[in-house]
């Protein structure tokens, strides 16, 4: 009955064999269970040991690959230097006298004849020096195991004979140190040059740049400066005059003060490539690799500044210091209120591991477990039309082993294949360290909506059967009109009843009558602020007779729309150099403005006076919304916080800390839920009292604007990735998605939830009809 090797049953003398009492049978079963439990424990210990060894092997593999790749690059570099020096010598030698020419020629020939003995001696000396340096700075060097089975990693040429000494990793400590230093210099160079490019402007975001200075200043190597100059030269080859206005709102990595408004030609980012970040690194090699860079907003705000000599604010760099110190996905400093860690710094468009390998080794431990990289062209198992998202950014199967290993160790997306340009820097599981079991739901389809519990546990959301159906839930949206504003459209709003659309651009607001199909020209133009200053926000009072406009100036303009021709009724002047967002109280008596200095100004519209300032944000306040009953205000800032304010008592109620800058937010008209758009490309839906939340991952870049439908059942978000996404409240089932030709900077929904208007970086606004 029992196999051999099991514990024998206790046998009492005086009784026939195999006749047990119930108690003896229970004892036997207990012994068997304890035996199995001991076996299970030993197997589990063995499994954990093997898992740790596997993780360590993956880290070693990537480190080995990094060394090999670095040496390969260095070899090609030195070869090219030698060729150029030879050319120079050949050009100079004819100027020498005949005898000197012969002497120099002989010396050159002798220099070329390096014997293996000399080479080995040189290598040994270099290794000794490197080991001394490693011991002095980082302790004993890390020794890597040989590649398993003696095989070379894919893409690495085999190393032979004495040259194998080049791959000795005794200097790994110093190599890692140099890697960190190079990365730091590269980021700081970006920050320094961006700041210098904005110094010529009357910058309303001096305080914004000030927050950048804490990231440290160091001496920049000549090599880093040279790389930056080469990047600019390469970008200038693809300049397009038609795109010059785009970078006024969207940062296109053109930091040359002499040419502040030139941006490369753009096309839709079919591969989901994060252009802004790739441009911040090494210069691209083709126009395709800088596609859509002109529709790339800076990471400082939802485009709170521009590289323009006009009075436009300067921004934080689009390559922020990576915040990889988050212990778990979604960690925040407030218990129970967690957010995704920031995206890793820029990724090169070349299909090799250069960018990923530039990351310091020390940050890999959090992301040791490999996880599934998958597309999210379908929702969490319930999308009715998968074709709607087809081609968003699928990862082809020919992913190389080295790239996959690097992705596992670094928590980054693997490159598609060596030499390929396109890859997705923001898959659903980007850099979160989530186990692969969370990458999909039981149906096997990729997940993009996750529920985050109070303790930070993330689980894919199983959508209810009525997620995409039911009263008040749209089926899709149809584009019905394009309003050619002529400048980048940073602000839009729709009148109630739905007839007029207001688009804010550079120095003016244009009014469009959308009740007449095919209308191609505005019915009125409201010139406000200065001619070169951008409108950031425009809000209608509930009666539709008054429009309030704010932007890159210290004044808010109040327009009387009821007069025969619109006229300026009043101007409100604040101490802040810019206003980034506006909100109106439901009773239309008070206006709230988000200031570039972080304060929230409260204005009495009847007396046209400043009555209060909410102080708390340590950096610019970028977005704002007010509760339906007018008792609570929500604000988001570039200090990575979302704050709520009690308007009756005039005090701060809550603060939610994140690891990413906040670019947009919206409060559900029916209460309870607050949706927040991040620089990290996530949308997070928070409950106003409970600590758990939802995290949505369909955007591939910064989420620049967000608006709830008036019914509260759905909301839309727009981003630097050219996408307009519609989500179900609160769990984020994707209702529909529309892709535009440039960054979508602003959006609004009509009061009857039948129309959506978006403003984009290609100087137009788009009107959508919502189909139910």
Swiss-Prot record:
GO terms for cellular component: beta-catenin-TCF complex; nucleoplasm; nucleus; transcription regulator complex. Signal peptide: none annotated. Residues 269-452 are annotated as: SP domain. Residues 310-322 have a biased composition (Polar residues). The modification Phosphothreonine is found at residues 259, 312, 319, 321, 328, 334. Ubiquitinated by XIAP/BIRC4. This ubiquitination does not affect its stability, nuclear localization, or capacity to tetramerize but inhibits its interaction with TCF7L2/TCF4. Ubiquitinated at Lys-720 by UBR5 in response to Wnt signaling, leading to substrate recognition by the segregase p97/VCP and degradation by the proteasome. Keywords: Acetylation, Isopeptide bond, Nucleus, Phosphoprotein, Repeat, Repressor, Transcription, Transcription regulation, Ubl conjugation, WD repeat, Wnt signaling pathway. Residues 197-207, 284-299 have a biased composition (Low complexity). It is found in: Nucleus. Placenta and lung. WD repeats lie at residues 484-522, 530-569, 574-613, 616-655, 657-696, 698-737, 739-771. Its main location: nucleus. It comes from the Eukaryota. WD repeat Groucho/TLE family members are characterized by 5 regions, a glutamine-rich Q domain, a glycine/proline-rich GP domain, a central CcN domain, containing a nuclear localization signal, and a serine/proline-rich SP domain. The most highly conserved are the N-terminal Q domain and the C-terminal WD-repeat domain. This is Transducin-like enhancer protein 3.
